[in-house]
Amino acid sequence: MSTSSCSFKDRRVSILCCKFCKQVLSSRGMKAVLLADTEIDLFSTDIPPTNAVDFIGRCYFTEICKCKLKDIACLKCGNIVGYHVIVPCCSCLLSCNNGHFWMFHSQAVYGINRLDSTGVNFLLWGNLPEVEENTDEDMLDISAEECIR
């Protein structure tokens, strides 16, 4: 991944939830834009969501680039919430990107900004460990108080 010339460490970390059923899909979300069309907002994550989504349908390619994609659906309600980049194309790999291969449509998910350990400041991607001690499974039982924040 070509991330050396661009930095994502100051981006906020979000909890990603399904808009249709409120299911937590990931605790490591980042607001992003589509590489092939920067007018399209989305969310992404670097770690495969655990017990929250599954593949649906067949692999496909877009007209804009040659990435091989497969849709993902929420396990709770069955709605398509995004896609996984199965095989990224050279053009996207060479672009300024965050290295994430799990993408979520902004029409299908919403993000809740996470707070750091002080509980006062937003958690930034640069302060997030590569592999967190808390897994996404732990985040599935998110409290109502956390969702309200």
From Swiss-Prot:
A Pfam entry, by short name: YPEH2ZP
Expression sites by tissue: Expressed at high levels in stomach and also in kidney and, at low levels, in heart (at protein level). In the stomach, highly expressed in foveolar cells, parietal cells and chief cells (at protein level). In kidney, expressed in endothelial cells, mesangial and epithelial cells (parietal and visceral epithelium) around glomerulus (at protein level).
Keywords carried by this UniProt record: Cytoplasm, Mitochondrion
Predominant localisation class: cytoplasm
GO cellular component assignments: cytosol; mitochondrion
UniProt organism field: Bos taurus
Presence of the UniProt keyword Mitochondrion in the record: yes
SUBUNIT field: Interacts with UNG.
Protein name as annotated: Protein FAM72A
Biological role: May play a role in the regulation of cellular reactive oxygen species metabolism. May participate in cell growth regulation.
Location of this chain's protein in the cell: Cytoplasm; Mitochondrion
Family: Belongs to the FAM72 family.
